[in-house]
């Protein structure tokens, strides 16, 4: 069965930015097409250009499509290759697909479309699940083998593309967004107490496979899951970031590393210019996004557009970094768009921002990315963005203290954790508190894994393969996809990340962090942007909660729904309401915003 709602066709693009979903039944019943269409409908913002559902017996796939690469309808999804007996639903972009297509054509494969989706199908047929090792890009996909009934799910190395899973009612369901699974009405939506502890401790990061809901899990990054028709499942992790170094790596000079980083980053930016449409940059004014602009300009990107956002100041804290983004825009003569957001508009946008979150995300810049993406999507469909540079090249303030640490887990927790488990016990109601410190145990286990000996390397590995996946990367995916915009992240090119992991940490920690990247950037961009205090995406009104913002969060946390749920200790909430500015986490976040955001997210999604 194949169903396609009528949708406008805008030329021809491929699997790029989209939403996928599916159902695999294990009880002999056929896939529920109406349910698949419901799930697909929830994800319409992710793929506003077209949509479709394909079902065969117990297996059904759904897809929403934003056209980026192959602008014809031959690339419609779910894609069925009747000759090979394979069906695919794919979300993402494979940057090296032209080379793979050429190689597969040499093996005798014939192609009926021009984009990357069909290349994945042929690659899977040729090389099995090992095909993922050959993909350079961001991806989440499902492939159904007609003859065996087997289904294969896969997610890229850094989890740039999401994939949520739920098992219920004799079936496995999957989707690009958690709300799409909730929309089935079949999943257990009770709160996972371990996930709650992670959220409240590990700076709102809930590592895979957990989510805030007991009935929803997420496929870990760099994982292929093979599901047989009888429901048996097997996971294979196909990539690990390795921080071990050869003697030659240790001996290499800072200048050599600088040149290698610049060459690799240049290649990463070039790869992400693949699309048949113009590319823009989310320009914060920091070194990461600025060097992307510089490299795109050097590569001859025509009509380069840049976008920057700023907010009203609060409590004497500035809300924009336009002085630096203006400098870069002028230097490269970009088509520059500056968006200033007054606090009233920021508040008005919060409900829609929270609705766009697949999981509760506490970072203030979610609303910034949401509003920025809204503006950018009026002009273009693809942007490059600087996420990942701090985690890959060591830009955060908690790395230098680890360099001489004898107790790396303690030192990491002291800088990164929002609260210890003892304090958490006074913030949560007793039935929600766990005596075992799950977040700390998670960090201990991760630090103990082989492949990273130096404490800084252990922290970089944790941050780049866990924290980055479930905070900055997810934030950018959710907020850009809310407006049908595709964000590409060159700093998460896996070859660049592998190179960076080999660089001794002293080269990363120099110059106040990201030293080797800053030296590479000096070859490209004006030094004023490099030799400055590290900035961030400031939204002061959410850090210093007062006035109408305070009214909004107090209303959510004292509502009937919140009282029935009973997550938080009432005395703790009253202290927060009385003096929000007194409760700031080590990472300079508001405790009140953290608890309010969780409650608002639950209510927004009808939970």
Predicted region positions:
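Basic polycationic patches enriched in arginine
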Residues: 2-4
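Cysteine-centered catalytic environments shared across enzyme families
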Residues: 10-357, 369, 519-523, 528, ...
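Adenosyl-5′-phosphate
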Residues: 11-20, 30, 56-57, 130, ...
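Conserved acidic
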Residues: 253-257, 261, 321, 360, ...
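Short acidic/histidine-rich active-site segments
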Residues: 380-390, 394-396
């Amino acid at each position: 069965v194949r169903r396609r709602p009528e949708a406008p066709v805008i030329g021809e693009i491929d699997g790029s930015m989209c939403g996928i979903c599916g159902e695999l039944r294990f009880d002999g019943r056929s896939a529920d097409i109406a349910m698949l269409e419901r799930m697909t409908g929830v994800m319409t913002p992710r793929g506003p250009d077209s949509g479709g559902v394909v079902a065969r017996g117990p297996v059904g796939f759904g897809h929403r499509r934003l056209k980026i690469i192959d602008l014809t309808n031959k690339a419609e999804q779910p894609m069925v290759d009747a000759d090979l007996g394979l069906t695919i639903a794919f979300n993402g972009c494979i940057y090296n697909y032209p080379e793979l297509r050429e190689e597969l054509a040499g093996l005798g494969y014939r192609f009926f479309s021009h984009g990357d989706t069909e290349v994945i199908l042929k690659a899977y047929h040729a090389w099995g699940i090992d095909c993922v090792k050959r993909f350079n890009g961001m991806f989440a996909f499902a492939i159904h083998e007609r003859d065996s009934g087997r289904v294969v799910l896969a997610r890229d190395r850094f989890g740039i593309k999401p994939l949520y899973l739920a098992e219920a009612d004799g079936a496995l369901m999957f989707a690009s967004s958690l709300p799409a699974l909730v929309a089935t009405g079949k999943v257990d939506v009770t709160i996972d107490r371990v996930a709650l502890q992670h959220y409240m401790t590990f700076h709102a990061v809930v590592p895979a496979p957990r989510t805030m809901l007991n009935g929803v899990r997420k496929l870990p990054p760099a994982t292929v899951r093979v599901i047989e028709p009888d429901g048996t499942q097997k996971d294979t992790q196909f990539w690990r970031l390795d921080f071990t170094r050869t003697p030659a790596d240790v001996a290499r000079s800072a200048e050599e590393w600088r040149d290698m980083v610049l060459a690799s980053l240049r290649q990463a930016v070039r790869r992400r210019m693949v699309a048949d449409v113009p590319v823009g940059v989310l320009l914060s004014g920091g070194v990461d996004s600025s060097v992307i602009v510089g490299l795109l300009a050097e590569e001859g990107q025509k009509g380069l557009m840049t976008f920057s956002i700023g907010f009203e100041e609060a409590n004497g804290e500035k809300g924009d970094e336009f002085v630096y983004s203006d400098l870069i825009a002028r230097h490269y003569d970009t088509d520059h768009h500056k968006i200033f957001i007054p606090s009233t508009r920021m508040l008005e946008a919060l409900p829609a921002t929270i609705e766009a979150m697949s999981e509760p995300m506490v970072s203030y810049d979610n609303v910034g990315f949401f509003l920025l993406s809204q503006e950018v999507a009026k002009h273009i469909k693809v942007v490059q963005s600087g996420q990942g540079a701090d985690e890959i090249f060591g830009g955060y303030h908690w790395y230098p203290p680890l360099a001489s640490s004898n107790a790396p887990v303690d030192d990491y927790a002291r800088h990164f954790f929002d609260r210890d488990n003892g304090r958490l016990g006074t913030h949560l109601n007793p039935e929600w508190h766990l005596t075992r410190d799950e977040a700390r145990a998670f960090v201990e286990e991760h630090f103990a894994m082989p492949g990273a000996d130096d404490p800084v390397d252990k922290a970089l590995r944790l941050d780049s393969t866990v924290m980055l996946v479930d905070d900055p990367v997810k934030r950018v995916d959710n907020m850009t996809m809310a407006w049908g915009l595709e964000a590409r992240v060159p700093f998460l090119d896996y070859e660049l990340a592998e190179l960076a992991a080999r660089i001794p940490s002293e080269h990363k920690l120099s110059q106040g962090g990201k030293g080797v990247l800053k030296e590479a950037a000096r070859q490209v961009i004006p030094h004023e942007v490099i030799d400055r205090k590290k900035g961030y995406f400031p939204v002061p009104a959410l850090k210093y909660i007062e006035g109408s913002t305070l009214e909004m969060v107090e209303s959510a946390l004292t509502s009937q729904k919140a009282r029935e749920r009973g997550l938080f200790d009432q005395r703790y909430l009253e202290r927060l309401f009385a003096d929000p500015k007194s409760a700031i986490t080590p990472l300079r976040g508001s405790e009140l915003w953290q608890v309010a955001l969780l409650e608002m997210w639950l209510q927004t999604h009808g939970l």
